[in-house]
């Protein structure tokens, strides 16, 4: 098999469209096989689009989100696999309430690791992407996604582990997504000001020390994917329960984004092949 294969592991449907989506669309368009693995069904996600906040949607939210995910995958040109766990929800309050019984974040780690190992050994990706140890933000399912992904990356290559889950496969590189960068937000906010408009990012920037962008300091790899930003946004809009089309995400014109920040960012977390940093290609150094 000489084709390149990329696996993007995400916690919920819609995460694949808000984190690294233009990169996955680019590689799929260039002929790589790309698979998105979604660990939960997003059953406990809030409805964030007022137009979809309807009783008939609430009553069948799991089915609706599956349909949304199928549309987004088609738009991005990727394959898709559900790992089959139940959304934990985002606990709120002080003190935080306990997580619901049976949710993904409370399932013993070995269960999702074994399922993901099986998918890895079947798809045989050269590269995987997932979240950092903080989950990108501290949602319990995102943190668990990190733990599961890293454990499965290691276990899939070990013939002693999960021998009934297929022939061992060593993924060559593992990356963390890093899409929430202060400098990008600052550039876009300044562009609004230059055009006599009030940008939507002031509320974020005022509490964010410009000298302490911990995410930017971790970036090793910047993938040029500006021509796929339209696909990214179309895929995100496909998740109509989760995305308000009038929300902040869509305020900055695509043309500004393409000119000011034409890349998506990643952190190389683990590699089994020689690497030279910084990079501009997730497949750099990979042996097909």
Curated annotation (Swiss-Prot):
InterPro entries: GlcNAc_PI_deacetylase-related (IPR003737), LmbE-like_dom_sf (IPR024078), Mca (IPR017811). Disruption phenotype: Loss of amidase activity on MSmB, no production of the mercapturic acid product AcCys-mB. Limited degradation of MS-RifSV, a rifamycin S MSH conjugate. Increased sensitivity to streptomycin, slight increase in sensitivity to rifamycin but no other antibiotics tested. Increased sensitivity to iodoacetamide, N-ethylmalemide (NEM) and redox cycling (oxidant) agents known to conjugate with MSH such as menadione and plumbagin, but not other oxidants. Keywords: Hydrolase, Metal-binding, Zinc. Binds 1 zinc ion per subunit. The keyword Coiled coil does not apply. Belongs to the MshB deacetylase family. Mca subfamily. Zn(2+) binds at residues 12, 15, 142. It catalyses: mycothiol S-conjugate + H2O = an N-acetyl-L-cysteine-S-conjugate + 1D-myo-inositol 2-amino-2-deoxy-alpha-D-glucopyranoside. This is Mycothiol S-conjugate amidase. GO terms for molecular function: hydrolase activity, acting on carbon-nitrogen (but not peptide) bonds, in linear amides; zinc ion binding. Monomer. It comes from the Bacteria. Its EC number is 3.5.1.115. Partially inhibited by MSH when MSmB (a bimane derivative of MSH) is used as substrate. Its cofactor is Zn(2+).
